[in-house]
Amino acid sequence: MDDVGRLWTGIGVCAAVILLMAFLTLCENAAVEFNDAKLKKMAEEDKDPKAIKLAALLKRTGRVVATNLIARSIMIIVVSVGGVIFFYEPISDGLYTLFNYQAPYYVSGICSFVIISCLLALVICTFGIGIPKKLCISGKVGEKFILNNCGVYKVFLAVFSPLAAVSGAVSAGILRLFGIKSTNKADSVTEQ
């Protein structure tokens, strides 16, 4: 594959994964910020099937957030690996030529790796996390979005839930080594 084709393929793969990450971020924020009283009314009184699905999903908010975190972490790894696979050689060769072959080849390799890492971090933070969160906070994306996409969101959560379960089990085991019970106090609300 030539360098131009490799670059376009890399851009396409990374963009697709970042869009999926943005979708998960939008869904998580919209679901967590959904008005509980309104959702309960829609599910129980209005018998809205979308609201019933969402209410069932949000019964375990901690698990949804943990699964979403695992999914986004895996997507960040996929984008990083894809960035190295698709962008490293063309950028490294271009930098080596730019340095007029004066520096050793590994210098251009290190520089290309740093460039790829910084650019991907910027793109992931901006388009995969920052903009979707701000869209939810501003109210542009909210209740209607999560109600319409709850089924698709549940599928993505189901795909990543085995990894979240393994991560939870490992975390619980490590916490037990330190004498800490793995009960989630964030889910229980106490009045003080």
Please provide the spans of the model-predicted regions.
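Membrane-embedded alpha-helical segments of inner-membrane proteins
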Residues: 1-191
